[in-house]
């Protein structure tokens, strides 16, 4: 059984695709080295590798500073420094012929080129479409995993069986059961009236603020909730919550009436996104209202969609009247289970050379 190195552009708490892939590889029996986003050694002292979850060991690479990447000489030196740290920790952990799995990040290509030069098996994960430097990354990688079908088929036409589809990763079955069984609302929701339309994440500029404003203005008794800094709506029925740790997301969902995903379909990246939060909603059977992003086209019976404010208002009205014990809620939960980390681990075991 080969081990794995996951290079992420976040921290472990983000619980994004790299973190879920780390959990999947650990389920297969691999020991995993998880590499968080590098930080400046002038800001933080180096910390030892620590065990994040059973079989998953994390560290944060140290560099001089991200600003130095604007010059090719110092950028190349910092890339080698990161590769050195990854290789050193892999050796200290006695990882067995580890596979390196990584998504797109700024300045990650030279790091991965250095690791490839040292003989590591490289697996690139295409998380967005369009993807910056896509051709350079797939040319470097031994294998490519693709989350969106928009990118999948052109890459398979080009590279054949080096490219594999990666279904979006829902939480583990045990975590889904925990989410579904949560009945206590998060205290931050106490001041927010119902019905609550919840975007269970940080928008990062990916939602259509104009659409949201028109909906909230037309329906002042509906309340939009998201996590992270204020979004500029400045409406009494728009609410921004401070950071919510992963173990409290269930409390947010317990107080949610509609899972709300008003992505901006005018932007190609957002039109092609594959939102992880969808499966958090599905895990508890919540009705979901969204703009019609491509990822949802295969599940029209599970999600309410609309392009315009009027269509989305009707979609929310339908979602709010959906029976709580109806069969559609059970089907959502079943789809979340199909996408569980356990099931994706089985897929990875088939497509990655983990047995030697």
Predicted regions located by residue number:
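Conserved catalytic-core segment of nucleotide-activated headgroup transferases in glycan assembly
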Residues: 21-24, 171-255, 278, 306-308
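Carbohydrate-associated surface elements
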Residues: 150, 168-172
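Conserved acidic donor-binding segment of nucleotide-sugar-dependent glycosyltransferases
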Residues: 302-310, 317-324
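A charged, aromatic-enriched C-terminal amphipathic alpha-helix characteristic of glycosyltransferases
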Residues: 184, 321-353
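Nucleotide-sugar-dependent
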Residues: 12-16, 204, 247, 251-252, ...
């Amino acid at each position: 059984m080969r081990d794995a190195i996951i290079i992420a552009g976040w921290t472990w708490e983000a619980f994004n695709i790299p973190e879920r892939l780390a959990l999947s590889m650990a389920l297969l029996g691999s020991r995993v080295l998880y590499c968080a986003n590098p930080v400046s050694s002038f800001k933080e002292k180096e910390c030892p590798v620590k065990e994040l979850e059973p079989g998953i060991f994390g560290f944060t690479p140290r560099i001089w500073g991200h600003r130095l990447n604007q010059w090719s000489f110092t950028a190349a030196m910092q890339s080698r420094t990161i590769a050195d740290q990854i290789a050193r920790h892999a050796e200290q952990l006695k990882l067995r012929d580890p596979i390196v799995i990584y998504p797109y990040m700024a300045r990650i290509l030279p790091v991965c080129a250095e690791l490839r030069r040292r003989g590591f098996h490289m697996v690139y994960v295409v998380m967005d479409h369009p993807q910056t430097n896509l051709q350079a990354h797939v040319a470097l990688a031994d294998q490519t995993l693709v989350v969106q079908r928009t990118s999948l088929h052109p890459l398979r036409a080009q590279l054949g069986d080096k490219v594999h589809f990666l279904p979006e990763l829902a939480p583990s079955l045990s975590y889904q059961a925990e989410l579904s069984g949560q009945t206590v609302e998060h205290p931050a929701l106490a001041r927010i009236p119902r019905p609550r339309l919840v975007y269970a994440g940080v928008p990062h500029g990916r939602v259509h603020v104009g659409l949201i404003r028109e909906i909230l203005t037309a329906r002042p008794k509906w309340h939009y909730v998201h996590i992270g800094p204020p979004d500029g709506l400045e409406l009494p029925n728009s609410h921004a919550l401070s950071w919510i740790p992963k173990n409290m997301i269930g409390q947010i969902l317990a107080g949610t009436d509609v899972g709300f995903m008003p992505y901006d379909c005018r932007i190609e990246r957002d039109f092609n996104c594959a939102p992880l939060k969808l499966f958090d909603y599905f895990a508890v059977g919540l009705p979901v209202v969204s703009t019609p992003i491509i990822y949802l086209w295969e599940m029209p019976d599970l999600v309410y969609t609309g392009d315009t404010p009027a269509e989305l208002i009707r979609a929310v009205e339908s979602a709010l009247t959906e029976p709580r014990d109806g069969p559609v809620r059970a089907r959502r939960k079943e789809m979340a289970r199909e996408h569980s980390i356990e099931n994706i681990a089985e897929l990875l075991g088939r497509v990655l050379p983990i047995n030697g």
